Amino acid sequence: MSMGIAARPPRAALLPPPSVPRSR
């Protein structure tokens, strides 16, 4: 399982880029 998670992009990648302001 660890291998599968490692293969996937980091949690940060899932979230929108910092450039895009959060839907406030």
From Swiss-Prot:
Coiled coil: none annotated. Residues 1-24 are annotated as: Disordered. Residues 1-14 have a biased composition (Low complexity). It comes from the Bacteria. Residues 15-24 have a biased composition (Pro residues). The keyword Chaperone does not apply. Keywords: Antibiotic resistance, Leader peptide. One of its GO terms (biological process) is response to antibiotic. This peptide is involved in the control mechanism of the synthesis of the macrolide-lincosamide-streptogramin B resistance protein. This is Erythromycin resistance leader peptide. It comes from Streptomyces fradiae (Streptomyces roseoflavus). The lineage of its organism: Bacteria, Bacillati, Actinomycetota, Actinomycetes, Kitasatosporales.
